[in-house]
Amino acid sequence: MIMELFHTILAIVALILSSAVVSSAEISLASPRKLKLQSLANKGDVRPLQVLKLQEHPGRFITVVQILLNMVAILGGGIGESALSPYIADILNRSFEGSWIAPTASTIAFILVTCLFILFADLIPKRIAITYPEMVALSVVGIMNFSMYVFKPLVWFFDTIANVFFRLFRISTVREDGMTSEDIFAVVEAGAEAGVLKTQEHYLIENIFDMQARTVTSTMTTRENIVYLDRTFSRQEVMDTLSRDSHSKIVICDNGLDKILGYIESHTLLTMYLQNENVVLTDPKLLRKALFVPDTLSLYEVLELFKSTGEDFAIIVNEYALVVGIVTLNDVMSIVMGELVSNEEEYIVSRDENSWLIDGATPLEEVTRVLDIAYFPDEENYETISGFMMYMLRKIPKKTDSVVYGKYKFEVIDTENFKIDQILVSLVKEQE
């Protein structure tokens, strides 16, 4: 009798272990990260490739899992209830009498076996598979491939019926594994929150992706701020301009910015003046040809142009061939570096925890990051916070004009001609 009980317990343990393997396979083979598996496969392990192959045809894998789970459950219930109930009844008969003992023993045996299967054949293995999907998947993929071979006729039968059902109702069974920019942002965000990525690395990655979305006008020096020399300037006018506004390169024009002849390296010009040389601003040996780019290019495209041409300075023109600004390699790279570098003049200055002073030329991306605003209305129509104010007010803003958007109030506090210089942003209570 003891040997029979031992054999029964051994059979139940074997069934629980079998069910645990299948349950863990059900979770682990469906959840491993494709990139992680490919990385493991590149190290020479063939098991990740087997997992990837199973993921390409999930129907057959799911079918064999369900066949095995149901077989084990039926066997476990039958063996457990019929084999254990006599022993439980014998224990009850030692203390009690009555016709209720047999059905009670069967119920106790059923509950006991069910609890064992739920705990050790389902919950624990699935929790382990969720926590270590790649490790568990690599451990069980061989067993599952063997099971699919053994039950191939049944797998084919059930999988065919399921496919007919899907085709009948036009349900796609193709798994979409395409990586989008949103997926990458989510992974980066999760890495930053988990501490895998440092704060600086987080900013760098986000800013690199911003380069494709942002146009060159978001970081250019605008037309009214361009420092230039006219070809007719005297030596004193040139020296006064250079002493007032020091830049490594300076634009040479012919009667205004809309006729740019090229640019000159400031240090070369100053060196020639210090050596008392006769300087002609239009001298071909001194004047360099400027790179002109349309204002529709993204920062990434401008960076590629700088790379291909060897230039680090470009003139930006609009569709009417009017100069709207200039951009340098340093301007583009400052977008990548973001908050890792300190600008001489910050676009956004925090007055206190509930208010900020913002330069009118601040790109929307900077405002959304600092104020944690998800998006601005119709933001494809403008690129700066000044453009947002004009769009919302539907007029040229003047002092004290304000806009309430979300939980913030945007108020114009300084203008110059038609340009917004500064905006005061304050936190307001949301209207109920």
UniProtKB/Swiss-Prot annotation:
Transmembrane segments: 2-22, 61-81, 100-120, 138-158
CDD domains linked: CBS_pair_CorC_HlyC_assoc
Subcellular location: Cell inner membrane
Pfam families: CBS, CNNM, CorC_HlyC
Limits of the CBS domain: 220-279, 286-345
Any GO CC annotation of this UniProt entry: plasma membrane
Repeat keyword on record: yes
Membrane topology, as annotated: Multi-pass membrane protein
Limits of the CNNM transmembrane domain: 1-201
Keyword entries, A-Z: CBS domain, Cell inner membrane, Cell membrane, Membrane, Repeat, Transmembrane, Transmembrane helix, Transport
Top-level lineage group: Bacteria
GO molecular function, a single term: flavin adenine dinucleotide binding
Cited function: Involved in cadaverine and putrescine tolerance in stationary phase. May facilitate the efflux of both cadaverine and putrescine from the cytoplasm, reducing potentially toxic levels under certain stress conditions.
Similarity annotation: Belongs to the UPF0053 family. PaeA subfamily.
Protein name per UniProt: Polyamine export protein
Organism this protein belongs to: Haemophilus influenzae (strain ATCC 51907 / DSM 11121 / KW20 / Rd)
Gene responsible for this protein: paeA
